[in-house]
Amino acid sequence: MAVNQTMGRASISYGSPVFIKASGSVVGQMESEGPLGSYFDKVGTDKDDLFGADSWEKAESALQKEAVGITLQKAGIKAEDIRYLFAGDLLGQNIASSFGVMDYEIPLFGLYGACSTCGES
C-alpha cells in the first residue's frame, strides 16, 4: 500500500523517524591536514588529488561513489536497504553526485547548495 508522504508542494513527511546509521567521508590531502583530519575515512595523496581520474568532475564522482561504499560497509547494509540518498556537489547540476552514485540505484534527492549541502540534508 502506497503512503502519501507529501505535505505541501515541496515538503515530504516520513512515516517513521529518520536516522543516520553510518557515514563515510573521502577527502583530499589538504582537508586531512585541517582540524578535522582524524575524522575522515579515506584521504587522497598529495600526488593524486584526482583519485586516479582524468578530470575534476570524474574525481568528484569517484569521491561520491567511494563515500557511499564506505557508508554501506560501516552500516553493514546493502544499497537496496536505503530508501533515499541526499547528495550535492560543487557542480551546479549535481552531475558528480548523480554519476557517482548511479550504480547503487538508490533514489537521489539532489541538493543544490554546494558547500551548504551538509546543512541542507
Segments predicted by a language model, with ranges:
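Active-site-proximal alpha-helical scaffold in enzymes
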Residues: 112-121
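Conserved "HGTGT" condensation-loop signature of ketosynthase/thiolase-family condensing enzymes
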Residues: 1-109, 113
